[in-house]
Amino acid sequence: KLFLSKSSIASTSEGSNGIFSTDKATVYANDVKITTKKGGNSRGLDATYSGVIYANKMNISTEGDHSASVATDRGGGYISVTNSTFKTSGSGSPLIYSTGDIEVDAVKGTATGSQIAGIEGQNRILIYNSSLTSTNDAISGSDPIKNGVIIYQSTSGDAETASSKLGDFEAVDSTLKTTISGGAMFYVTNTNAKVVLQNTKLDFDSSKVDLINASGNNSNSWGSQGSNGGKVTFTGIKEILKGNITVDTISNVNLYLTKNSKWTGSATIENNSAGTTSKSPLTVNVDKSSKWVVTKSTTVSNLNVEKGGKVVDSKGKTVTIKVNGKTKVKGSSEVVVTATGKYSDTIKTSSKSSLSTRVL
């Protein structure tokens, strides 16, 4: 074990992490300033092969490429950070990058050369009471599209250890902001994912940027074309969501609006001719207290709306819902939602729609 307090760490070379824990070692850090300059692959906190880091009152700044403020890498690891400040400026240097398990609480951070956060493989990021911003308006690293948060699986082997069965991103009582002018706030490709947001503000230009993009890719050998789609269960709890959803036919988005949540947007199911069409690319679930404000006529695979839940247009008028060519709900709006599969008045939730137990 290592205990470090009221200290300053600086590095100027390639591959020089500020604090590094590996092989089941544990580090406790409090009131430490970490600065990594010039050299790439120089993270502030890095844990691999079941290494553990507990950190509080950290001030972390990195300048190089592939230098996240906080990262878990090959072999997985666990990092918790509280009451801290993050800053990154390099390409491919998100504030948080997880191939393990990372929790942050009461953290403020700004990334100027990368997205907010990234999860590779079946790993996890949990965010509480934090404000994280990306001011980068370029594609981060070698990503296929611009994004605020990416959940994916590469072929690097870095994400060989899983801390959960899904790539799991959760944010509670927080603010996530990106200034990208295209792409998606959440981008999922070549993996299965879970996103849960509770009382968290998403700040992005929803007129230009999708809320969610789940699709296959032809970049970086991230899976085989036609079978490398993204699958995500995306849940809002007491959430105000804006922005459209794009999902291709080899992918799957299962959206849940719960506990007084509201989503304003529409959806597009794009054809991916390289693979077999998913049975249900897009399912929208609206509980009895929530609302979907449909901004234009939209086709979904399945639509489940509990009694009391609302599906309306921007003027508050009930939209028409058609299921397999038959009118299920006759609305007063010109907007039409078409379900090619099933329509019901019940929704079924699972652990994929629930917040994880906090470790912090």
For the regions a language model picked out, list residue spans one by one.
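Long, low-complexity, polar and repeat-rich extracellular regions
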Residues: 1-360
